[in-house]
């Protein structure tokens, strides 16, 4: 559960991420594909090379979804319901991959905002991404 301080940290972080969410999403995907090559199996039709238009487009989807989630911290299940259905029923993504992408997102945000990525912000963003992952995998059962 996100505390009021966690929510404030997430809102502040996404305020700084601002218009870079799509770029950070793409960068995090690239990090994930390089660091965890088995994740590439979900994207056999993608050009996974650095800077690929397909990775950038999917990074935008990731960034947009996280921005929407950050705007709806008190009702993540409703905000992410369609995305949860998609990942559970159509794409059938292994839930462990959300944890891997979350890690890569944290690394990406830390790399771009080292002065703002305090231990408290790190913990709050980690909790937020864990909550998002939990919602996205909630319909697998």
UniProtKB/Swiss-Prot annotation:
The alphabetical list of record keywords is: Acetylation, Heme, Iron, Metal-binding, Oxygen transport, Phosphoprotein, Transport
Q: Give all Phosphoserine modified positions.
A: 3, 49, 102, 124, 138
Matching Gene3D superfamilies, A to Z? Answer: Globins
Q: Which residues carry this modification: Phosphothreonine?
A: 108, 134, 137
Which GO molecular function annotations are given, in alphabetical order?
haptoglobin binding; heme binding; iron ion binding; organic acid binding; oxygen binding; oxygen carrier activity; peroxidase activity
* PTM annotation (N6-succinyllysine): residues: 7, 11, 16, 40
> Which residues participate in heme b binding?
87
Designated name of the protein? Hemoglobin subunit alpha
Tell me where in this chain the PTM Phosphotyrosine is found.
Answer: 24
* Listed GO CC annotations: blood microparticle; haptoglobin-hemoglobin complex; hemoglobin complex
What gene is it encoded by? Answer: HBA
Q: Which InterPro entries match?
A: Globin, Globin-like_sf, Globin/Proto, Hemoglobin_a-typ, Hemoglobin_oxygen_transport, Hemoglobin_pi
SUPFAM superfamilies attached to this UniProt entry: Globin-like
Please describe the quaternary structure of this protein.
Answer: Heterotetramer of two alpha chains and two beta chains.
The parts of the chain that form a coiled coil are none
Q: PANTHER family attached here?
A: HEMOGLOBIN FAMILY MEMBER (PTHR11442), HEMOGLOBIN SUBUNIT ALPHA (PTHR11442:SF48)
- Record family assignment: Belongs to the globin family.
Entry-annotated residues carrying N6-acetyllysine: 16
**Which GO terms fall under biological process for this protein?**
hydrogen peroxide catabolic process
**Tissues/organs with expression:** Red blood cells.
Q: Describe the task this protein carries out.
A: Involved in oxygen transport from the lung to the various peripheral tissues.
Where do the Globin domain residues begin and end?
Answer: 1-141
């Amino acid at each position: 559960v996100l505390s009021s301080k966690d929510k404030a940290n997430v809102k502040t972080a996404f305020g700084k991420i601002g218009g870079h969410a799509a770029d950070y999403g793409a960068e995090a995907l690239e990090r994930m594909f390089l660091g965890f090559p088995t994740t590439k199996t979900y994207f056999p039709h993608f050009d996974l090379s650095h800077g690929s238009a397909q990775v950038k487009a999917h990074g935008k989807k990731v960034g947009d979804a996280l921005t929407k989630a950050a705007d709806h911290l008190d009702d993540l299940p409703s905000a992410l319901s369609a995305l949860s259905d998609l990942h559970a029923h159509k794409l059938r993504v292994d839930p462990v991959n959300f944890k891997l992408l979350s890690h890569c997102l944290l690394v990406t945000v830390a790399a771009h905002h080292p002065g703002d990525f305090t231990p408290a912000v790190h913990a709050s963003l980690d909790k937020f991404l864990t909550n998002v992952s939990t919602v996205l995998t909630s319909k697998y059962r």
